[in-house]
């Protein structure tokens, strides 16, 4: 399920940075029953910084073997999907008893929020923009559906929650499908 459907979304709340492995969690984006999502930074030499999104299993869910397996499967599936229209998983691990995965940070909004804001203003999404978003998302989904192993065996990856909350639009106009879990 997507952030909007399984998490209580919050506008990113600035928080005191929390060190979490090599990441510094700087904003809490959403909290759900099973996991929480943060905007995070890494710091390198010479002032080099990178933004990521870290999805971390809540402590009480780390004992749930079925959920941990689903989380591991999400990480494995998404890690093999390298496409311009899919949010890339860049790291997966365990710190203490908590599993996490780190993804590229898409600076923008999800389509659900865009549609809600337009509705509040009694406006419609321009047809050309709607078609563009749908076509770009379809490119990412098509890549996932056609993904195969090096031996040519189809992986049969299907996104189980294609919804506006899982289609992200960057401020630069990039469209990316998120949350293959």
Where on the chain are the PLM-derived regions?
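Protein kinase catalytic-loop region centered on the HRD/HxD motif
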Residues: 138-157
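Conserved N-lobe ATP-binding subsite of Hanks-type protein kinase domains
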Residues: 36
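Activation-segment/catalytic-loop signature of the eukaryotic protein kinase fold
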Residues: 92
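Activation segment signature within eukaryotic-like protein kinase domains
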Residues: 133-134
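AlphaC helix of the eukaryotic protein kinase fold
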Residues: 58-80
């Amino acid at each position: 399920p997507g952030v909007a459907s399984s998490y209580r979304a919050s506008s990113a709340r600035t928080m005191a940075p929390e060190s979490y492995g090599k990441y510094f969690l700087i904003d809490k984006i959403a909290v759900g029953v099973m996991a929480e999502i943060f905007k995070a930074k890494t710091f390198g030499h010479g002032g080099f910084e990178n933004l990521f999104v870290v999805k971390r299993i809540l402590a009480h869910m780390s004992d749930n073997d079925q959920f941990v397996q689903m989380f591991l499967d999400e990480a494995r599936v998404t890690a093999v999907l390298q496409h311009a229209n899919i949010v890339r998983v860049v790291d997966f691990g365990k710190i203490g008893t908590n599993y996490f995965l780190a993804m590229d940070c898409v600076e923008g909004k999800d389509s659900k929020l865009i549609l809600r804001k337009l509705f509040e203003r009694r406006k419609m999404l321009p047809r050309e923009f709607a078609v563009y978003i749908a076509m770009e998302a379809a490119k990412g989904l098509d890549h996932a559906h056609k993904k195969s192993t090096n031996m040519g065996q189809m992986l049969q990856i299907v996104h189980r929650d294609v919804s506006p909350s899982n289609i992200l639009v960057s401020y630069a106009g990039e469209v990316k499908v998120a949350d293959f879990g």
